[in-house]
Amino acid sequence: MLAHMPAARTFLQHPDPLTREIAEGYAGGSFLMDNGDGLRWYGVPGRALVPLTEDAGLHVARRMRRELKHFRPSVDLAFDEVIAGCRGHLPGSPERDGEWISDELVEIYQHLHTTGLAHSFEVWQGDELAGGVLGLALGGAFIAESKFHRLTNGSKAALIHLAEHLDRQGFALLDAQIQNPHLATLGVYEVTDKEYRRLLRRALALDVEL
């Protein structure tokens, strides 16, 4: 009988070499970016983490809480569209933070999506894609690579819905990588690299599914 393998170990020991390489890099605390000089591994001294609940520090203004009801969340329903939105390639996606996502990295994300490591989290208004988050799920850690919105508050709604979804699924960590003023309004906070790696190790040991 095969031994049960926690989700993170599934990718760290994956038969596909690329999936295994990427999983090992993220499990070690690094992340991929292309800042115009080729694809490289990066790390930052202060890692931005999103609280998963309001009790843990997630800030959801009363008006935003009311607006959330108008955004319908989903997982992996529009992966290619979310990548395009993050790159600013979708009509009406003014806010994006994925200009660093090169064509090569798009191909990697698409490959990782087929092996189950890369995911999209979307929010919709009716049949219209309002915003989304692109990321990797490894054990109980979700590493958010990029986000975008097409409708007002779309990226904010996506991140809040994602945090609450991860909490329900038993995840322990939502990593936003790099802090910015927009994230700070949601209660996103920074931890040192040493603390991040400690939290990441604990999250990787969890056997949860997105």
Curated annotation (Swiss-Prot):
Does DNA repair appear among the keywords? no
* Entry GO MF terms: leucyl-tRNA--protein transferase activity
Q: What is its EC number?
A: 2.3.2.6
Q: Which GO terms describe its cellular component?
A: cytoplasm
Check the record and name the SUPFAM superfamilies matching this protein.
Acyl-CoA N-acyltransferases (Nat) (SSF55729)
Provide the protein's localization.
Cytoplasm
Question: Which biological process terms from the Gene Ontology are attached to this UniProt entry?
Answer: protein catabolic process
Question: Does the entry feature the keyword Transferase, yes or no?
Answer: yes
Catalysed reactions, as listed in the record: N-terminal L-lysyl-[protein] + L-leucyl-tRNA(Leu) = N-terminal L-leucyl-L-lysyl-[protein] + tRNA(Leu) + H(+); N-terminal L-arginyl-[protein] + L-leucyl-tRNA(Leu) = N-terminal L-leucyl-L-arginyl-[protein] + tRNA(Leu) + H(+); L-phenylalanyl-tRNA(Phe) + an N-terminal L-alpha-aminoacyl-[protein] = an N-terminal L-phenylalanyl-L-alpha-aminoacyl-[protein] + tRNA(Phe)
Ordered alphabetically, the record's keywords are: Acyltransferase, Cytoplasm, Transferase
Give the family, as the similarity comment puts it: Belongs to the L/F-transferase family.
* Cited function: Functions in the N-end rule pathway of protein degradation where it conjugates Leu, Phe and, less efficiently, Met from aminoacyl-tRNAs to the N-termini of proteins containing an N-terminal arginine or lysine.
Alphabetized NCBIfam families for the sequence: aat (TIGR00667)
In Swiss-Prot or TrEMBL terms, this protein is called Leucyl/phenylalanyl-tRNA--protein transferase
